[in-house]
Amino acid sequence: LFGQNAVNSETKFMLKPHTLLTGINGFVGKHLANLLLKHGRNVYGIDIQEKCMVPGVTYFQMNICDHDSVRRICEQVKPAEIYHLAGVASPSGFHLTPNSSFQINIMGTISMLDAMRTVSSNAVILLVGSSTEYNACFSESGFSEKNPLEPTSFYGVSKYVSEIIGQYYVRHHNLNVCFTRSFNHTGPGQSPSFVCSDWARQVAEIEVNNAVPEISIGDINNTIDFSDVRDVVDAYRLIMEKGKKGEPYNVCSGKGVNLEYILHYLLAKSSSPISIRVQTDKVSGQNTHTGCVGENRKLRQETGWSPAIPIEKTLDDLYEWWVKELEVKKY
């Protein structure tokens, strides 16, 4: 099957396969689980929290680094598809706890791959990586999958090493693994530790709670490749269905957006003027890979994917999500 489509018969997916999703309670995990349920999958989820946040999922609370528990779950579920999203998902998380963060991202990947090596070597596994595996200073044009990998952050290193480990299991154990190098994405439900959600929350606080009409920002002189999370999870689904074994795929919009544009778009949501306070110690893009725009030609050609949601719609929905969240807390 090497070099052929990871799944070369749509009949297989008409049989409601068992789909295992690690990190299901995360920002992307929740969106992906809901999409897969709509597409008729039997979704099983793994995360560290006590309860699953997605209705309709068979849930297992566990530590992804616990190899024996991962193997037992895989033996029980017998998944045909595995989306591996579990791990520390932000550079700031690595800065605060580098040792444990690195262990989670690396050992969690090994636990999942090794379990599938012994339980179900025919399953298709998607390892979600990051654009931080690239060196943002390397390419004046868009990054393609052929660009060298040279991460400049500890988080990027963890994703780079995870991909190397995945390639080892492809070559030496014949596992059917595909890889993403996912660029920045945002949308409803994202943590305010990320720039778009941070600003949307601050503006919503002013509107809902009559907070002081002032927004705190850091440096906004950055151009960033943003995708809507709903486009991203659809790309993951299509890579699972049509991606090629051992291949990496950039998941990105292919367009750069200036942070200043995003800021002023969100400020326009307010019914009253908002002053801007620049904090020199605050980095607007601390969890955002800045200066890095991707090329998505390979993903488009091999899976038929294309981004459908413009950044303005993404920001509209993100802002409205925050308004609803704050209104619920208010009452």
Predicted regions and their residues:
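NAD(P)H-binding glycine-rich loop region in Rossmannoid oxidoreductase-like domains
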Residues: 64-104
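C-terminal "lid/loop" region of Rossmann-like NAD(P)-dependent oxidoreductases
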Residues: 214-215, 219, 247-249, 258-264, ...
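Non-catalytic, hydrophobic alpha-helical segments
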Residues: 232, 236, 251, 262, ...
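N-terminal Rossmann NAD(P)H-binding glycine-rich loop of SDR-like oxidoreductase domains
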Residues: 19-38
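Rossmann-fold cofactor-recognition segment
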Residues: 56-66
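Amphipathic terminal alpha-helices
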Residues: 15-17, 311-331
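NAD(P)-dependent short-chain dehydrogenase/reductase
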Residues: 137-142, 164-224, 229-238, 256, ...
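Catalytic helix-loop patch of NAD(P)-dependent Rossmann-fold dehydrogenases
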Residues: 96-99, 103-111, 124, 132-179
